[in-house]
UniProtKB/Swiss-Prot annotation:
The keyword Phosphoprotein applies. GO terms for molecular function: GTP binding; GTPase activity; translation elongation factor activity. One of its GO terms (cellular component) is cytoplasm. The keyword Phosphoprotein applies. This is Elongation factor 1-alpha. This protein promotes the GTP-dependent binding of aminoacyl-tRNA to the A-site of ribosomes during protein biosynthesis. It comes from Artemia salina (Brine shrimp). It comes from the Eukaryota. Residues 153-156 are annotated as: G4. The modification N6-methyllysine is found at residue 55. It is found in: Cytoplasm. Residues 14-21 are annotated as: G1.
Amino acid sequence: MGKEKIHINIVVIGHVDSGKSTTTGHLIYKCGGIDKRTIEKFEKEAQEMGKGSFKYAWVLDKLKAERERGITIDIALWKFETAKYYVTIIDAPGHRDFIKNMITGTSQADCAVLIVAAGVGEFEAGISKNGQTREHALLAYTLGVKQLIVGVNKMDSTEPPFSEARFEEIKKEVSAYIKKIGYNPAAVAFVPISGWHGDNMLEASDRLPWYKGWNIERKEGKADGKTLLDALDAILPPSRPTEKPLRLPLQDVYKIGGIGTVPVGRVETGIIKPGMIVTFAPANITTEVKSVEMHHESLEQASPGDNVGFNVKNVSVKELRRGYVASDSKNNPARGSQDFFAQVIVLNHPGQISNGYTPVLDCHTAHIACKFAEIKEKCDRRTGKTTEAEPKFIKSGDAAMITLVPSKPLCVEAFSDFPPLGRFAVRDMRQTVAVGVIKSVNFKDPTAGKVTKAAEKAGKKK
């Protein structure tokens, strides 16, 4: 085997009926982790259920159903390969918690693939004021997904089919729209596709003779190609933040017989390795890491993106919980926050939000009520310029700079320092009513916390 391919994450966005599932299913089906046996099983079931047309969306429906039932499905099913990358689809919308997942997401997407439907009237519905196309694209940009690919889907159902004029019309309109959000259209590949029939998905289609391919320009250089797969291959690989101080939000804490306390989570920045003295914020508990495991194999060191379990000494399961953050006690350790200042974008709140509003915030793995202590200013979502100082209230569509105060100890960071710990979803009435990006944090002075014997011993050894 040659050198392993780089792993990248994409998120697929777009309006409900744009054909996201079919397109995604097609990629997974053709280049992906679904083995022949599973596909045959799905096809057989599809025929029995009279879904003979089957195609690709069904693959995705099956996977989604399993994911939502909480069956830990083989994540390989959500992966596929390009010439350069292993691609993981981290979430496909349509899932009720999509927005929340995208924010607290187990991972940051490196690129968003926006699917728009070219069918008569369909594109217009998706991009209309209340269509989801706009909201998803804005969210992706706000949350730091700076690369975008646009798939103009259902080219087979334009009038006439595979119409160049329709493709150009959509390209022009979407370009204007994404430019408003902050994307540079010159760096975005627009690919006319049919996710159902497969035109321009993996191979150039002869049914669009007018289409000469896409080409993009960005400061890292130019790229061009014909298909959606080519465009995915042209994604700029992410730099994984290994050099930064460790931040590892805990997803769970287990007590394992014969081993002891094992916190589990994903390394967001930095590295973790046996022998390291870690501090858990906001509780300020410091102890030594005895071992680090991933998929039941012990590691010398874990890096950003790795989901790991690590064994800590002299700390009981009761002292740690989901939402705490592990960090290196000797390198800019994490601390609890007194309050923090954030840009908040209200997505869908039926009323008015004023000072004192206290919804639940989902930030990395933490889930804690926070008070909107002071709405300092309303601002333009795109430029960040102030439009009104100290507004009495804000409502859907507004962006504002707000000071938030957590009701219980909480560990967050500025988005510019640690992106995964600096973005949050505001949940109320069982839905995501707003999203936020943290600009600055007012940290608590750590009160004397618990330092375990193991940490003291290890500290002396150094």
